[in-house]
């Protein structure tokens, strides 16, 4: 009813007394609403204020202008408490109210700064530009009061709409124009459009029209730079300059911090429920702007602001992540490292400030999960921005491995087969068209992305379960393998292999029940020690042809005429003997380079493809059964196994002499054709030392190598040596390897250098670490006299004797992934003083040591045992 009596009677003629009374009521109401609005947006100035509806109250949650206007109306209706202006702010408050009283309805939100007669309507700033920031900063310096700038930053950086419009690219400035951006703009237009108003009606109009007003901001589209599909509209250099100027002021930095706390939940909501990126790709700007804040890793951000921002950023759709990654890939190494360290700092802080265990999983910590997802974007930016080779893929001409004729356990139970399409591929790799394997040299080393504190608290059995189930509400760190060390990933692979073995065993039992015939639940190999290659080759070839799925069963080896039961130790010796036999230079399957101590495929080998397939199967089985092999391949072999062809740079590892010669050719400054007189025809020798000529191009003997085509010659030569000359042998080798590992997450989790570590173990033998982790049983302790003497003897061994000792106790002379400290050896007492030699259970890394009467006898018996240890018997 009140609205009916505001101005006129029904007759249309104003009654002077009522009009005056109505005007005074409206003025009083307007004045009170303005005070509430001022209190909500600027506060009373008292830092110890306890009024929950005052911006100066420490517990007050900041809000934007529109929300403050609505709240001011509500407070006016309930006659809420109003603060008295604090002495430190009394002048400013009085001026604010005074301006409000005298201002017209559409401009009551103005703040006037009259030091030099300049007037800036800071409340009309709906977005920021570099010029605007410097202008406000200059005026604040003149007044020695930075609170207006702090409020502007708080308002813009807490609003997604405002931040998206800020720091837009414009047409290219000249150097003189860039310098003038930092100077005070004396001729600034005083008639800018006003965004906020203090009256209730104006504020409500603001609320309805804010989005359209931002879209029609004074940064006209005709002044914006035209952008490509992968370009962004934000001026990153301008943002960096602004941050450099502002972050040195502690109070201004606090404004950024508080704004981020308010901004992040709203952004998360926009991305989760409103599909905002598909409607406005420029929404990505706010993530770019925030990530340029070089103080994000500081302790103040780690508690709340950065975790909230990470949660919001992790909600970006795949297309937005891809665009952000492509942008970041253009950054230099220092900028990538800064962003990487920001997320690593948050993960480490959250890990060490909580107690994680099997009941309180690190996978359930939202901040760590979100930070890991954000770190993944930085990781792929590091990959894409490095030296990338997306060509030279072995997989392009790879023959598919036939599927097993047997049904899987899932199919037997009426479910669709899982992993039918092979191992998983990261969606980001598909989006970017780049794999980690394609990166020859990242911007910063891959090792810097590993977070050791996280690896220490990660319950890998639980994480693997989440990895396989792929539920939305459970995160697996195996989807971010870059953050895991080789030991943790190896454990995940171990679980995958074991579960696959048990699955094959259950399938066998089901088949036995259904078909009524006894099938072997193991991959059983019975071999003669002196005919190991022939026996193993025949058996494995039959399995590979009849049912390749049997290769995924648990390996069980028997040596004919020996009593050893294979709990792992017999398999280790089987692998060792096979490797020794196959890599014997007399057989001629591989050539040996004395300078590098490495083997390479013999292009002239007379051996059948089946034997190369066997080597591939053996390597796959070694990984599958968690055994270490003493093989010495160059790194290019593991790259080729993972799907990449060898290139010129790989020759440096596999054929260093040839690599240096070709490198000298590329760097030669003279006339190559006249001085070297070489053609596209090369010469090689066969097994008997006879020369063989090969044309790298058609009629290669007639094509001279010149300064212009020498690069082509080097590439063709490298391709011939590493790929074409050994194509038949390597295809068979790779096929055997993939028969065992084709459904494994091996390729998803590991890089080529880590595959080498899995197969060959560590070459660094740290016996001090072995001593620290060894356990004792049967009466021995760490402080037993014989144990102390034992370690003195072992530490005095030569390197060769140490390898023999490892071979005797563990079945291999190499350290496992993670070093000898991960071996968990046990030394147990095996009776009193005796003439018997020490014995071992290589399956369980147990050394059985009698209590010898003297140190000399202990050394003599131990050396004899490790020197003449061959074969297996039953104790």
Swiss-Prot record:
Keyword set includes Isomerase: no
Chain intervals with Basic and acidic residues compositional bias: 175-186
Biological-process GO terms, alphabetical: androgen receptor signaling pathway; brain development; negative regulation of TORC1 signaling; ovarian follicle development; positive regulation of Golgi lumen acidification; positive regulation of phosphatidylinositol 3-kinase/protein kinase B signal transduction; positive regulation of protein ubiquitination; positive regulation of transcription by RNA polymerase II
Catalyses which reaction(s): S-ubiquitinyl-[E2 ubiquitin-conjugating enzyme]-L-cysteine + [acceptor protein]-L-lysine = [E2 ubiquitin-conjugating enzyme]-L-cysteine + N(6)-ubiquitinyl-[acceptor protein]-L-lysine
Subcellular location: Cytoplasm; Nucleus
Effect of residue 260 to Q: In AS; uncertain significance
Polar residues bias spans: 213-225
MF terms in GO: transcription coactivator activity; ubiquitin protein ligase activity; ubiquitin-protein transferase activity; zinc ion binding
Key words of the record: Biological rhythms, Cytoplasm, Disease variant, Host-virus interaction, Metal-binding, Nucleus, Phosphoprotein, Proteasome, Transferase, Ubl conjugation pathway, Zinc, Zinc-finger
Zinc finger C4-type: from-to: 44-83
Phosphoserine PTM positions: 218
Residue ranges of the region described as E6-binding: 401-418
Segments for region (Interaction with HCV core protein): 418-517
GO cellular component term of the entry, any: glutamatergic synapse
Transmembrane segments: none
Effect of residue 679 to I: In AS; uncertain significance
Positions of the HECT domain: 776-875
Function: E3 ubiquitin-protein ligase which accepts ubiquitin from an E2 ubiquitin-conjugating enzyme in the form of a thioester and transfers it to its substrates. Several substrates have been identified including the BMAL1, ARC, LAMTOR1, RAD23A and RAD23B, MCM7 (which is involved in DNA replication), annexin A1, the PML tumor suppressor, and the cell cycle regulator CDKN1B. Additionally, may function as a cellular quality control ubiquitin ligase by helping the degradation of the cytoplasmic misfolded proteins. Finally, UBE3A also promotes its own degradation in vivo. (Microbial infection) Catalyzes the high-risk human papilloma virus E6-mediated ubiquitination of p53/TP53, contributing to the neoplastic progression of cells infected by these viruses.
Oligomer and partners: The active form is probably a homotrimer. Binds UBQLN1 and UBQLN2. Interacts with the 26S proteasome. Interacts with BPY2. Interacts with HIF1AN, MAPK6 and NEURL4; interaction with MAPK6 may be mediated by NEURL4. Interacts with the proteasomal subunit PSMD4. Interacts with ESR1 and WBP2. Interacts with BMAL1. Interacts with ARC. (Microbial infection) Interacts with HCV core protein and targets it to degradation.
Name of the protein described by the UniProt record: Ubiquitin-protein ligase E3A
Lineage: Eukaryota, Metazoa, Chordata, Craniata, Vertebrata
């Amino acid at each position: 009813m009140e609205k009916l009596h505001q101005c006129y009677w029904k007759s249309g003629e104003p009654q002077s007394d009522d009009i005056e009374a109505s005007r005074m009521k409206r003025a009083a109401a307007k004045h009170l609403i303005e005070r509430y609005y001022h209190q909500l947006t600027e506060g009373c100035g008292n830092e110890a204020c306890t009024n929950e509806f005052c911006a100066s109250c420490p517990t007050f949650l900041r809000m934007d202008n529109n929300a403050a206007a609505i709240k001011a109306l509500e407070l006016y209706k309930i006659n809420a408490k109003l603060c008295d202006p604090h002495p430190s702010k009394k002048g400013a408050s009085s001026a604010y109210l005074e301006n409000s009283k005298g201002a017209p309805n559409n401009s009551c939100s103005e703040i006037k700064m009259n030091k030099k007669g300049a007037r800036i309507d800071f409340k009309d700033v709906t977005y920021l530009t570099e010029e605007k920031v410097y202008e406000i900063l200059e005026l604040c310096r003149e007044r020695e009061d930075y609170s207006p700038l702090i409020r502007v930053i708080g308002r813009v950086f807490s609003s997604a709409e405002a931040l998206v419009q800020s720091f837009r690219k414009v047409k290219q400035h000249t150097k003189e124009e860039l310098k003038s951006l930092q100077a005070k703009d004396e001729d600034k237009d005083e008639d800018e459009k006003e965004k906020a108003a203090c009256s209730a009606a104006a504020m409500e109009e603001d609320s309805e029209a804010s989005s359209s007003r931002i879209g029609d901001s004074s940064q006209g589209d005709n002044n914006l730079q035209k952008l490509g599909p992968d370009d962004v509209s934000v001026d990153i250099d301008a943002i960096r300059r602004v941050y450099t100027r502002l972050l040195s002021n502690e109070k201004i930095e606090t404004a950024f911090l508080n704004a981020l706390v308010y901004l992040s939940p709203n952004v998360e909501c926009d991305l989760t429920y409103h599909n905002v990126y598909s409607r406005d790709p420029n929404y990505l700007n706010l993530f770019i702007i925030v990530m340029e804040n070089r103080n994000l890793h500081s302790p103040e951000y780690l508690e709340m602001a950065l975790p909230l921002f990470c949660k919001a950023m992790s909600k970006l759709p795949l297309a937005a992540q891809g665009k952000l990654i492509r942008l970041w890939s253009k950054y230099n190494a220092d900028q990538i490292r800064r962003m990487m360290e920001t997320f690593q700092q948050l993960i480490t802080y959250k890990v060490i400030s909580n107690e994680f265990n099997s009941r309180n999983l690190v996978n359930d910590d939202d901040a760590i999960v979100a930070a890991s997802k954000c770190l993944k974007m930085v990781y792929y930016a590091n990959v894409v921005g490095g030296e990338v080779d997306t060509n030279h893929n072995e997989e392009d001409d790879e023959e598919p491995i036939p599927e097993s004729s047997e049904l899987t356990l899932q199919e037997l139970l009426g479910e669709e087969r899982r992993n039918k399409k092979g191992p998983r591929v990261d969606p980001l790799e598909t989006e970017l068209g780049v794999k980690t394997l394609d990166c020859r040299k990242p911007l910063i080393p891959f090792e810097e992305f590993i977070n050791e504190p996280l690896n220490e608290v990660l319950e890998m059995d639980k994480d693997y379960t989440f990895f396989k189930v792929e539920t939305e509400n459970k995160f697996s760190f195996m989807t971010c393998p870059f953050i895991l060390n080789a030991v943790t990933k190896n454990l995940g692979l171990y679980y995958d292999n074991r579960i696959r073995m048990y699955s094959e065993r259950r399938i066998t039992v089901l088949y036995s029940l259904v078909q009524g015939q006894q099938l072997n639940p193991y991959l059983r190999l019975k071999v003669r020690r002196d005919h190991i290659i022939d026996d193993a080759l025949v058996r494995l070839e039959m399995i590979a042809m009849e049912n390749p799925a049997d290769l995924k069963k648990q390996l069980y080896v028997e040596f004919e005429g020996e009593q050893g039961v294979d709990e792992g130790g017999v398999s280790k010796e089987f692998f060792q003997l096979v490797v020794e036999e196959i890599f014997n230079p007399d057989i001629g399957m591989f050539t040996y380079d004395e300078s590098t101590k490495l083997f390479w495929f013999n292009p002239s080998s007379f051996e059948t493809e089946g034997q190369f397939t066997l080597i591939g199967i053996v390597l796959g089985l070694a990984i599958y059964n968690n055994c270490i092999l003493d093989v010495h391949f160059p790194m290019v072999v593991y790259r080729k196994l993972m799907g990449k062809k060898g290139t010129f740079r790989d020759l440096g590892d596999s054929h260093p002499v040839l690599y240096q010669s070709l490198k000298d050719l590329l760097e030669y400054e003279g006339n190559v054709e006249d001085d070297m007189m070489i053609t596209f025809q090369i010469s090689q020798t066969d097994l008997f030392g006879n020369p063989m000529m090969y044309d790298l191009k058609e009629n290669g003997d007639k094509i001279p190598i010149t300064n212009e085509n020498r690069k082509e010659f080097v590439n063709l030569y490298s391709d011939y040596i590493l790929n074409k000359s050994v194509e038949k042998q390597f295809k068979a080798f790779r096929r055997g390897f993939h028969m065992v590992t084709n459904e494994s997450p091996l390729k998803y989790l590991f890089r080529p250098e880590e595959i080498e570590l899995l197969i060959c173990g560590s070459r660094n033998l740290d016996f001090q670490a072995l001593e620290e982790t060894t356990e004792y049983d049967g009466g021995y302790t760490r402080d037993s006299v014989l144990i102390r003497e034992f370690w003195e003897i072992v530490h005095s061994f030569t390197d060769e004797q140490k390898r023999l000792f490892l071979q005797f106790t563990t079945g291999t002379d190499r350290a496992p992934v993670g070093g000898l400290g991960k071996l968990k050896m046990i030394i147990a007492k095996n009776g009193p003083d005796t003439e018997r030699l020490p014995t071992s259970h290589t399956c369980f890394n147990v050394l059985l040591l009698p209590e010898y009467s003297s140190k000399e006898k202990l050394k003599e018996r131990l050396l004899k045992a490790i020197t003449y240890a061959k074969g297996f018997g039953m104790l």
